[in-house]
Amino acid sequence: MLISRPRGTSDLLPGDTARWQRVEAVIRDLCRVYGYGEIRTPLFEATELFQRGVGDITDIVEKEMYTFTDKGGRSLTLRPEGTAPVTRAYLENGLHAVPQPVKLFYVGPMFRYDRPQAGRYRQFHQFGVEIFGAADPAADAEVIALAMHFFDRLGLAGLELHLNSVGCPGCRAVLRRKLADYFEPRADELCANCRGRLRKNPLRLLDCKEERCREAGRGAPVPVDYLCPECGGHFGRVQRYLDLLGISFKLNPCLVRGLDYYTRTAFEILVPGGGAQDAVGGGGRYDGLVSAIGGPAVPGVGFALGLERTLLLWSRQAGEEVLPQGPVVFIATAGETEETATVLLSGLRAAGVPADREYTGRSLKAQMKFAAKLGARWVIIVGKDELEAGEVILRDMGAGLQTRVSLGEVVERLRRDARG
């Protein structure tokens, strides 16, 4: 019986990875331009990191984490998101002691036990950035600008930026009381999840996608109505910077995000009409996260974008087929010439020319068809008669022309051609 991949995962074949590499190249180039250094953290962390950082009453921690106990009795969790691990690494490696701000980016897999659907997997990939040590609202605008620039570089159109402020802990304490007072008489109108949230974190009721909860919350208090003067001023400056940068946005008073560490700015980037899973990414400010996991009070802001969703949207909009890069040169053999083909192949690769050779013993005609399928620009035909004359046949696959070339000169000729 064939063993299948686990549900909610995917295999990326060469045709897929060519598209991923294009996206990753855009990420790395943009982060270089914006001044972010790459960070890579472990795939698993202490479970406590996410309980303290993400929030132990969030859906992620309560329902979606892959948690296990290792042989030493330690509780470990496959990372469900990237910000808490990057924050832990920032602290543990002393980056809080160097001149601030510190600007980091990451690309890698995350893990959540969620219901698989289009663009949503149990192992999924995120591109994220974090700025530590910058409380200025201009930093909020910068990470938003970087995210929008990323989608623009991919040629994706029609995305909407939704913006809100969830305030500071002082603002939210007042808002929570107001929300509890509003929703408690309407508890019977809420879904089961929201009835639980009402007792634990009523702010999350604003973010529910269930129609019955949306209807019940139409007159509910919203964060922007309870911002303190400092948070209100910060939010106004973020909007001003976005206006200066020419970045359009929609104010969404019910946007709260699903992680407890957010303070002040919260944003999402959405595909209009995309349904419940229309967000391709989001982020915001998290000024209390560093201290929540044992560090000093350091402000932070960042985002995370879902790469599977981004690639799904890219394929729908662009329809561009990115083929895997085949060899520039394919070496075909005719007769007992395999040893010469092997030495020639090694010489081409040493010269930096992408090359491959025949390994299956098929006919010369079949080899030529295979080379065409690979997209090879040139084919070197190593035949017994030609070798006796110290030559090979070099075929230009695009022009359909071929010529005899000295065996000692063919590598240098193709090296020059490959470099253009």
Curated annotation (Swiss-Prot):
Enzyme class: ligase
Pfam families on file: HGTP_anticodon (PF03129), tRNA-synt_His (PF13393)
SUPFAM superfamilies (alphabetical): Class II aaRS ABD-related, Class II aaRS and biotin synthetases
PROSITE patterns (UniProt xref): AA_TRNA_LIGASE_II
EC number: 6.1.1.21
Reactions catalysed according to its record: tRNA(His) + L-histidine + ATP = L-histidyl-tRNA(His) + AMP + diphosphate + H(+)
Keywords from the UniProt entry: Aminoacyl-tRNA synthetase, ATP-binding, Cytoplasm, Ligase, Nucleotide-binding, Protein biosynthesis
One Gene Ontology MF term: histidine-tRNA ligase activity
Species of origin: Desulforudis audaxviator (strain MP104C)
One GO cellular component term noted in the UniProt record for this chain: cytoplasm
Oligomeric and partner information: Homodimer.
Family indicated by similarity: Belongs to the class-II aminoacyl-tRNA synthetase family.
A single GO BP: histidyl-tRNA aminoacylation
Protein name: Histidine--tRNA ligase
Keyword hit for Protein biosynthesis: yes
InterPro entries referenced in this protein's UniProt entry, alphabetically: aa-tRNA-synth_II, aa-tRNA-synth_II/BPL/LPL, Anticodon-bd, Anticodon-bd_dom_sf, His-tRNA-ligase, HisRS-like_core, HisRS/HisZ, HisRS_anticodon
Top-level taxon of the source organism: Bacteria
Localization, UniProt: Cytoplasm
